């Protein structure tokens, strides 16, 4: 169960960006440990292998992006690091756009690359 005293950070990475996400988490482990973590399924598995506790949703194509989007609406997410592969084709593109749109609607900070992710985790 997430700690109510910690902010919640959602971590999502497309397949071509999962290695970057794991490297980012490892490079920033002291800061990342200050958050409750939630992630899409496969990304969450890799983050667990890096030694962190994470609440895993379904994988993105199976509805994980939509599950995280619902948590945005419910006020359970404080920030999102979403390392997207802008050159890839994703069958669940509507869910991705929904997550991005709801982050904007609910004014949730969203980082889509390593530079902005580094700023986001320090600012939350």
Annotate each language-model stretch with its function:
Residues 88, 96-124:
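Ser/Thr/Gly-rich flexible loops in soluble cytosolic domains mediating phosphotransfer, phosphorylation
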Residues 6-8:
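Nucleotide donor/acceptor-binding cores
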Residues 19-30:
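Histidine-anchored nucleotide/phosphate-binding helix
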Residues 10-18:
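Short, glycine-rich nucleotide/cofactor-binding loops
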Residues 34-43:
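Short internal beta-strands
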Residues 36, 53-63:
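Short hydrophobic/aromatic-enriched beta-strand-loop microsegments
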Residues 63-102:
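Mid-chain, well-packed structural core segment of small domains
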């Amino acid at each position: 169960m997430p700690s109510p005293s910690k902010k919640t950070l959602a971590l999502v990475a497309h397949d071509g960006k999962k290695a970057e996400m794991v490297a980012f988490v490892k490079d920033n482990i002291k800061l990342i440990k200050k958050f409750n973590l939630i992630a899409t399924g496969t990304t969450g598995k890799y983050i667990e292998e890096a030694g962190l506790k994470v609440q895993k949703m379904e994988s993105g194509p199976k509805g994980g992006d939509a599950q995280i989007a619902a948590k945005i609406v419910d006020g359970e997410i404080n920030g999102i690091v979403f390392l997207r592969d802008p050159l890839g084709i994703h069958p669940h593109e509507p869910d991705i756009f929904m997550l991005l749109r709801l982050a904007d609607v609910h004014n949730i900070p969203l980082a889509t690359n390593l530079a902005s992710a580094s700023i986001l985790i320090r600012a939350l």
